[in-house]
Amino acid sequence: DMKKIILALLTASIIISSCDILDKYPHDAVSRDSVSEEDLELLYTGLYCYSQYKPGFEGYFQNDMTGGDFFRGGGSVWPDAPSWIKDFFLPTNGWIQAPYTGYYALLYQINSFIEVAEKAAQTDKVRQMLGVAYYFRALDYYNIVTKYRIAPLMRVTSNDPQPNSTEEALWAFVNEDLEKALAMCPEYSTKYYVSLQA
């Protein structure tokens, strides 16, 4: 009996003492309050990725479709651009939903970056990254307002539904962010990155 009690106590002490291994920060996530400049650079790289891929193929292709600049080949069931546009541009169609959702997914990432970067030490590098983030947010809203005219204006990260803003308010916000971007963007380094000259 004594051996069973000792074994039970030993097992319990091992289990209890090993619980602190779970109290460590995850290796694949960073608290918003402890983001370093190195972490910001990784998030910054993500902004370039999101800005390119989140609106989706449809987001970039919509302008060509609605402008009548794209025509299908001879084997198409749509004889002309207006027929195709009429069929594809319904509110329930993915050609409308996917870019809209993508623009706001991108906006969520941009706003998250801005909120974290504004709390960081304002080194030249951080200010330049903030300038690029403001540019991306202005570009995102430019795409939203030119395609949808009215949409929710999200200045901060939120998952709560927001009412639509007026077209004038959206354009004013685009201009506000472009002014911030002009004050902070880095000088030209390569054609692949946002710069003051671009």
Task: Describe each PLM feature range.
Residues 7-11:
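Sec-dependent N-terminal signal peptides
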Residues 41, 76-148, 160-168, 179-191:
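Conserved, well-structured interaction surfaces
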Residues 191-198:
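Amphipathic alpha-helical protein-interaction segments enriched in hydrophobic
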